[in-house]
Amino acid sequence: ENIGPVNLNGLSLEKAKLRLTNRFKKVYPGIQSRKTFLNISVGIPRAIRINIAGEVNLPGTYNFSAFNTLYNALYVAGGITENATLRDIKLFRNNKLISTVDVYKFLTEGDGSSNVRLENNDLILVNTYSNRISIDGAVKSPGKFEMKDEETLLDLLNYAGGLSENAFKKSIKLTRIIDGQLKVVDINSDQFDFFKPSAGDVFQVD
């Protein structure tokens, strides 16, 4: 009797053996009664070719083992350039977009689901960033952060590690070009969770 295909992708050797045993014992009673045993081993993994394009330091086509992931590929390609997006890395398979990777999810939340396992002839495309927002002063990790259109000042504060212990928490100064003029306004704390930063904004936490 045909047991059909068994997907072992991403499993350890022990978990793969358990899954195969559970599948086989439905067909072969000897396995369930422990009169017959199942052994598995891993041979040399097959090679896959991955294309990496866009804002990486060493774009091109690379050979990997079949167990490699998107982040491994970016590392081998020399990492991303200064102008690269971290929020919109695209993975194409068979000429179709199958995943849009937001590295911030991994860096800030530990969400490893974005580290997709690669398959032969995949294309990784790293575009340029859309906009970056600066935040300086009394935050734990000041700097420039790439922001999505729907994100708020509260999101920016989270990316910057939050306010420092000695920060003035009631408001944050925003420097923005409005009607061709540079203006400074205060954003009060009750606005943090809905105020949306724009490209070129500079926030200062006192």
Question: How would you name each of these model-derived features?
Answer:
Residues 1-206:
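Ser/Thr/Pro/Gly-biased, low-complexity, turn-/loop-rich segments
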